[in-house]
Amino acid sequence: MNIDKPQISLKNISKKYGKHKILENINLDIYEGDFICIFGKSGGGKTTLLNIIGTLEEYDEGELICFSEHNPIRNEKESEVLRRYKIAYLFQNFALVDNMTVQENLNLAVKYSRSTDKKSIIKKALMDMGIEDKLKSKIFELSGGEQQRVALARNMVKPYEIMLADEPTGSLDSENKKIVIDTLVKLNKLGKTIIVVSHDKEFEKIAHKNYIIENGKLKQLEFAVEK
């Protein structure tokens, strides 16, 4: 684990939508094995910041350094490599293909794995998420909680070092919420870097570093859990 050099470094990142500056001079270093949660009001810039970290959205000012690569968002080829092999994204709306089966959705992700036994990787991910019996089910046949577990399994079968999670427990019942949180904690203990944006105060208890976005500014909160 490299604790000397950040995996991701944001330097004076700013972003506008029209005349409204939603992010202003954001500075954040993210290290391997971090578990970070970012809180804030709806529409306050949390998801925008997550998208910038994941190279899904451009910023107007500042500098983004990902795995020692300067400003990868300016180079689409570098951004694509990061998204395929370094960064996994757990979207709020799951981002699954509704008319495909669970297996077909996972096949889209596992193709980037260097393992020669991709079937075993899929089987283990589904068992870890407790949905191995849903392999042949279409996504639209599943509950919201089951879909989020499929989305997590999809990320687990692809190569990644950082997982970004946008409101991962927002629409889940208590059982599925516990499964998702426990899985994120387990992945973090295995060395994965986890970055969550959420309204869920449960993350206060498990994150190593907690932040809040207020009026476009990122502020670190005092409560946190040691690694």
Name each model feature, range by range.
Residues 54:
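Helix-to-loop junction immediately C-terminal to a conserved catalytic motif
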Residues 163-166:
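Catalytic Walker B motif of ABC-type/P-loop ATPase nucleotide-binding domains
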